[in-house]
Amino acid sequence: MQKKVKVKPNSKQQKIEEQPDGSLTVYLKSPPVDGKANEELIKLLAKKFDVAKSDIRIKSGLSSRQKLIEIDRDV
């Protein structure tokens, strides 16, 4: 499964909002420095979708706020 994700680093709280188009807006506490925000993003998405962190990959947008995430789910 692939999801478009818009990341908002340096937020006061962590939360995930689903948008009407199926994309996600993810608010992260971490700054976008040294991959900290990406690590926090993967951790939050793994918890939301109940998968291991290793099952989530950033396909594109590694250094951007607009990302394409791939989630491997055994269904």
UniProtKB/Swiss-Prot annotation:
InterPro entries: DUF167, YggU-like_sf
Coiled-coil portions: none
Span list, region Disordered: 1-23
One Pfam family cited in the UniProt record for this chain: DUF167
SMART domains: DUF167
Entry GO CC: cytoplasm
Record-linked NCBIfam families: DUF167 family protein (TIGR00251)
HAMAP family: UPF0235
UniProt family annotation: Belongs to the UPF0235 family.
This protein's name: UPF0235 protein Npun_R3528
Organism: Nostoc punctiforme (strain ATCC 29133 / PCC 73102)
